[in-house]
Amino acid sequence: MNSQPLRVGIGGPVGSGKTALTLALCLALRDRYNLAVVTNDIYTREDADFLVRNEALAPERIIGVETGGCPHTAIREDASINLEAVDQLNRRFEGLDLIIVESGGDNLSATFSPELSDLTIYVIDVSAGDKLPRKGGPGICKSDLLVINKIDLAPLVGASLEMMDSDTRRMRGEKPFVFSNQKTGQGLEQIIAFIERQGLLTAAA
């Protein structure tokens, strides 16, 4: 059993699929790990409410944080409100294995404080255009895992997945990335394998 839970930060622009990924991870991992979630919204708890409505986890395992300002600040410069939520979950549930911290939607410069997140997953979506990986930024270039979501929309928006693949490799070097479609579950197993491998997670027997 881990003395401290693995904290996985999930960031990305508004509408990229962060909450859908968080839901999918909860449904896939909740029977294998002692799991909890912190979500961030500026003025509401909409993402937390979505997870509760979809029965991602028991409601008491989900804390919705209202940042009241720039979502980037709440995960980077002043992460105190999120750190308090993490501490609250640790006190509430002994022996947590994993806490997912989902940021509010932000721009490509958003990054997590190392005090808040052990691993960072950054989510972008194909509907923003195939040039998005070339724009760079810490999320695209430096996150531990980049998820390129909504690949089913590529034909509808005229995006080239091949171009996104080559541009992402150029921008990220050896850092991993995954193409995904959360509607069908494509890419989810790769994301889970990354979290387990890099986070040294071991499921309870």
Swiss-Prot record:
An example Gene Ontology biological process: urea catabolic process
Gene3D superfamilies, sorted: P-loop containing nucleotide triphosphate hydrolases (3.40.50.300)
Main location: cytoplasm
UniProt cross-references to InterPro entries, sorted A to Z: CobW/HypB/UreG_nucleotide-bd, P-loop_NTPase, UreG
Molecular function terms, GO-annotated: GTP binding; GTPase activity; nickel cation binding
Location(s) in or outside the cell: Cytoplasm
Top-level division of the source organism's lineage: Bacteria
GO CC terms: cytoplasm
SUPFAM superfamilies: P-loop containing nucleoside triphosphate hydrolases
Keywords of the record: Chaperone, Cytoplasm, GTP-binding, Nickel insertion, Nucleotide-binding
Binding site for GTP: G12, P13, V14, G15, S16, G17, K18, T19
The family this protein is said to belong to: Belongs to the SIMIBI class G3E GTPase family. UreG subfamily.
HAMAP family in UniProt: UreG
Subunit structure: Homodimer. UreD, UreF and UreG form a complex that acts as a GTP-hydrolysis-dependent molecular chaperone, activating the urease apoprotein by helping to assemble the nickel containing metallocenter of UreC. The UreE protein probably delivers the nickel.
Role played: Facilitates the functional incorporation of the urease nickel metallocenter. This process requires GTP hydrolysis, probably effectuated by UreG.
Alphabetized PANTHER family for the sequence: UREASE ACCESSORY PROTEIN G
Protein name: Urease accessory protein UreG
Originating species: Pseudomonas savastanoi pv. phaseolicola (strain 1448A / Race 6) (Pseudomonas syringae pv. phaseolicola (strain 1448A / Race 6))
Gene it is expressed from: ureG
